[in-house]
């Protein structure tokens, strides 16, 4: 395993974002955590440094360290076959067959062999009484070995689906021997609990967003315009981006950021979906819905689909992106002129996060047309920014949006007409859209910021120790 360095981030800065009651609760939780975990290490183990899990750890662990907790982050080592098995498990946990490969005895033997080697690397580091948080299916097989070391083990599964079937059963059959040995299992929704786990072994902890992270911190309109112009996402003169120290620095080159349609014109109202290039995010469905509802939309409305630049080895993402580009090519010329596809540069993690932040703040309406969703942090991010959101009622999106109160939900995730009807309503009723956006921001402040997330883990550790 390799170590990801974690620096402290001031909890006081997070507390300053909260109301007085929440801030006092956070301070009390900090003191309790320091007492509970004195002399212990909290190990977090993930399959990768990037992705949604990496983003959560990158924001949560610095706060824990500032609170006096020895929080550390380890990333698995593995060969290509191990990560193919992990990716297969990840897909199947969403009831998606993925690459269609096996999850049988040979795969189990390889999985256990790689994790055994990882366990050996930290044998002298993890002490009895430490707390180990294992994130997602790739790490679950470490639970028995960590328990033998005397650690208290929590398996945190960030995945799940509301429609369990035979595909999902394959993943649980593979994972059950290890997961059943964890002291506690943390899920994002109660409906994600498999039958072999008793209810008292499971805790439900929703993810959160950090209001001070590059993806979610405040950006004034000038900064939003500058970021989007620099990246070539919205038309306008490109200028240097201002770094965290206040000094100008060149933005990443915009070449290739727009894959279709060119920059969104300045002054256009943008309907945005920003997601991974993942079949279950249904970017192609959003594009088709826009085309089918095009005649009902005002002439100043443009669609922007934005995802991260596709890594050379990620054939699944490349297939989704290529499918969107093929659909775009087949659109009527007047629709193509108002539909845009972008791949956001990933060479600078902070810059990528700032671009997502700027896109969400720039959008007139944010869409999340997922076919399945574990929780849906892109929805949380847009809600935090006070944007009116149209999303499909799948997974954890249902726990974030109350239809007509802080967003609009489409019950059937395949309902293209329903999505565009909701979008058109928000564009036609700006006062209603603004009310939804304000309610959305307020709900995230109450329920989905880092303070609540941290305190729930303090409660969980208190149970175990």
Predicted feature residues:
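Catalytic cores of nucleotide-sugar-dependent glycosyltransferases that transfer UDP/GDP/TDP-activated
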Residues: 1-465
């Amino acid at each position: 395993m390799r170590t990801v360095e974690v620096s402290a981030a001031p909890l006081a800065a997070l507390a300053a974002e909260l109301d007085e009651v929440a801030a006092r609760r956070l301070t009390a939780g900090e003191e309790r955590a320091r007492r509970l975990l004195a002399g212990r290490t909290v190990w977090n183990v993930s399959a990768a440094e990037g992705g949604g899990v990496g983003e959560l750890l990158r924001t949560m662990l610095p706060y824990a360290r500032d609170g006096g907790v020895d929080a550390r982050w380890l990333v698995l080592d593995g060969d290509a076959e191990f990560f193919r098995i992990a990716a297969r498990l990840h897909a199947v946990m969403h009831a998606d067959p993925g690459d269609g490969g096996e999850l049988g005895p040979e795969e189990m033997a390889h999985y256990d062999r790689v994790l055994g080697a990882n366990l050996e690397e930290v044998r002298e580091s993890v002490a009895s009484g430490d707390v180990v948080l294992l994130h997602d299916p790739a790490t679950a097989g470490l639970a028995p070995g960590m328990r033998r070391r005397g650690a208290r083990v929590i398996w945190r599964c960030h995945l799940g689906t509301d429609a369990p079937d035979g595909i999902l059963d394959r993943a649980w059959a593979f994972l059950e021997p290890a997961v059943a040995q964890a002291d506690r299992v943390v899920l994002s929704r109660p409906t994600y609990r498999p039958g072999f786990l008793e209810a008292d072994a499971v805790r439900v902890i929703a993810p959160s967003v950090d209001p001070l992270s590059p993806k979610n911190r405040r950006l004034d309109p000038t900064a939003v315009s500058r970021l989007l112009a620099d990246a070539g996402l919205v038309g306008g003169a490109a200028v240097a981006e201002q770094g965290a120290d206040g000094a100008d620095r060149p933005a990443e080159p915009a070449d290739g950021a727009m894959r279709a349609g060119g920059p969104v014109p300045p002054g256009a109202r943008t309907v945005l979906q920003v997601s991974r290039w993942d079949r279950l995010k249904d970017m192609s469905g959003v594009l088709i819905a826009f085309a089918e509802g095009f005649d009902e939309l005002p002439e100043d409305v443009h669609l922007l689909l934005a995802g991260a630049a596709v890594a050379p080895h990620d054939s699944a993402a490349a297939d989704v992106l290529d499918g969107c580009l093929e659909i775009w090519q087949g659109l009527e010329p007047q629709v193509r002129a108002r539909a845009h596809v972008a791949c956001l540069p990933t060479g600078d993690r902070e810059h990528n996060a700032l671009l997502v932040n700027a896109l969400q703040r720039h959008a007139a309406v944010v869409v999340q047309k997922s076919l399945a969703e574990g929780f849906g942090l892109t929805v949380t991010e847009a809600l935090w920014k006070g944007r009116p959101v149209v999303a499909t009622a799948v997974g954890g999106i249902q726990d974030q949006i109350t239809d007509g109160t802080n967003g609009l939900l489409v019950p059937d995730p395949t309902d293209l007409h329903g999505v565009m009807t909701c979008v058109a309503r928000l564009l036609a009723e700006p006062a209603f859209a603004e009310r939804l956006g304000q309610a959305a921001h307020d709900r995230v402040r109450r329920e989905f910021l880092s303070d609540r997330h941290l305190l729930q883990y303090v409660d969980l550790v208190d149970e175990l120790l």
